[in-house]
Amino acid sequence: XFENERGVADPVGFFDPLGFTADGSVENFKKLAQTEIKHGRVAMLATMGYITQEITGKLPGYLSPSTGVKYDDDINGVLGLIKIVPAGLWGIMIFYAALSLA
């Protein structure tokens, strides 16, 4: 039912391996498409954050004074989640939830 929608292209055609659109609901399909666009835009902004830091350098000072984490510390992955105080993580999650609901 969605073979003629925007983004469907050869040679794959309509691609939904997990069956999110199996119910055939056009409203559900449009909501999923909008969600995919939002997530793509957030990912692009995150990538620009990495590029900006490489070009301009990182801020002086502490990201988390209580844990001794500076802005220029190189912390990646799960270790980054452990080092940041819970209030900071809640702030990130609330901000992302607000973006998702907008």
From Swiss-Prot:
It is a multi-pass membrane protein. Keywords: Chlorophyll, Chloroplast, Chromophore, Magnesium, Membrane, Metal-binding, Phosphoprotein, Photosynthesis, Photosystem I, Photosystem II, Plastid, Thylakoid, Transmembrane, Transmembrane helix. Chlorophyll a 1 binds at E36. GO terms for cellular component: chloroplast thylakoid membrane; photosystem I; photosystem II. Photoregulated by reversible phosphorylation of its threonine residues. Signal peptide: none annotated. The keyword Magnesium applies. Chlorophyll a 2 binds at H39. GO terms for molecular function: chlorophyll binding; metal ion binding. It comes from the Eukaryota. The keyword Iron does not apply. It is found in: Plastid, Chloroplast thylakoid membrane. The LHC complex consists of chlorophyll a-b binding proteins. The N-terminus of the protein extends into the stroma where it is involved with adhesion of granal membranes and post-translational modifications; both are believed to mediate the distribution of excitation energy between photosystems I and II. Belongs to the light-harvesting chlorophyll a/b-binding (LHC) protein family. The light-harvesting complex (LHC) functions as a light receptor, it captures and delivers excitation energy to photosystems with which it is closely associated. This is Caroteno-chlorophyll a-c-binding protein. It comes from Amphidinium carterae. The lineage of its organism: Eukaryota, Sar, Alveolata, Dinophyceae, Amphidiniales.
